Amino acid sequence: LNPLKDTYDYDDLARDYLDMTVPSKGDLIGKQSFGDIFSEITMDLGQEASENGKEELNSGEQCLCYMAYTAWKSRERLTEKLKETGMEELFFSIEMPLIYSLFHMEQAGICVKREELQAYGERLRGQIETLEQEIYQGTGEVFNINSPKQLGEILFGKMELPYGKKTKTGYSTAADVLEKLAPEYPVVQKILDYRQLTKLKSTYADGLGAVIEADGRIHSTFNQTITATGRISSTEPNLQNIPVRMELGRLIRKVFVPEPGFVFLDADYSQIELRVLAHMSGDEKLIQAYREAEDIHRLTASQVFHIPLEEVTPLQRRNAKAVNFGIVYGISAFGLSEDLSITRKEALEYINRYFETYPEVKKFLDRLVEEGKEHGYVTTMFGRRRPVPELSSKNFMQRSFGERVAMNSPIQGTAADIIKIAMNRVDRRLRREGLKSRIVLQVHDELLIETWKEELDTVRTVLSEEMKHAADLKVS
């Protein structure tokens, strides 16, 4: 009902839906965790703590009572709001069953080879130390590379490199500034590499090692109410953001292994958001392109650049791919020019050609923006609402952001709804058939199944059937 919030404290529920003011969790227990509370709760309910014979609850017990009461009492009002907003079906058919799917996935966890993770960390440490020495030699000074202030003084003060932007706290050493310098100054590229490796080590080599539990598995928390578009997110740790763009990043995936007797089997929705765009826009040319072409990016390049399919170059395909995915996110000519390192005029020409090729897509995206302005929100195919308050802003940049949100949210949100439906169907089928195999990870459009080897063919069938029937799209 309010997807722009990422926390839903009981005192907020009481205020917003029950017209009540109650003490907050912070008021009652401060910074204590619920683990601390449970350990303190007195189990002797027969003990009388006051003269009138009634029990006196401690602050932890009061907090739990308020949580239970506000959840129970606000149910009727929240259900009414779901009906009023047309999201009752979404809530009861998708989100509520998903609680069980996510619980089963969190309970299963994913196995990690601790020794390989430690070896990976040692490898990173060695490379980081080597880079440190090379950076000291390249700059002619020993300093704290992790200090933006010291790094800025060395690069732009001492070495007098170009593009120095002085701020109140010193020179900016943001990635976009350093990336401009890297092609001409090898030491700057080493600094960028150093940053990547130190992040890999702290976040993954060290971070993952700290959360491996006694069963040898990592049990992440999967959240269904954090993102505004309805996407599932992962925290403690984030297993949806394992890097894949650099070789050392990809190596981290090798520490995740199936249990003995099991194998990993994954299935994803290929280009799900583009397929959703084709379906929701109803653009017949784009729908036909998906039905006929194995490579939608080559076909788009052929149509946008008006050349035969067999003559499409790798560069033209890459540019068409950037346009295809950029359109989904409401990309501007400036944004596309930055992505492809071309002029803004060329980028605008690419976008215009795309819309000339798929005119119903342009009409659909424009319609989404107009609906967002009129109603204050946009909706997914399944009725999920995404408020877009930025569309009414007096600030041009805010309004432009709002337009991109209005164009993208129904597409990304619909894709998120589809993968949730697929998760529910797959999880339910695996359990109904009494299989040992289980979902261990969901990464946006992909499901990873820890599959008992003897069930491999069965699980392949389950994934294929249940994911295909999650939604009825004009392009499958």
Model-derived regions, located:
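Conserved beta-strand -> loop -> alpha-helix junction used to position metal-binding or nucleic-acid-contacting
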Residues: 1-3, 9-12, 293-297
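Conserved, non-catalytic sequence blocks in retroelement Pol enzymes and Pol-derived host proteins
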Residues: 3, 145, 267, 289-291, ...
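Conserved "right-hand" nucleotidyltransferase catalytic core of DNA-directed polymerases
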Residues: 5, 9, 13, 29-250, ...
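Conserved catalytic core of nucleic-acid polymerases
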Residues: 47-53, 107, 219-220, 224-227, ...
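Hydrophobic, well-ordered secondary-structure elements that form the walls
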Residues: 147, 230, 268, 301, ...
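Conserved catalytic alpha/beta cores of large enzymes that bind or transform nucleotide phosphates
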Residues: 253-277, 288-321
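C-terminal structured "cap/appendage" subdomains that terminate the fold
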Residues: 426-476
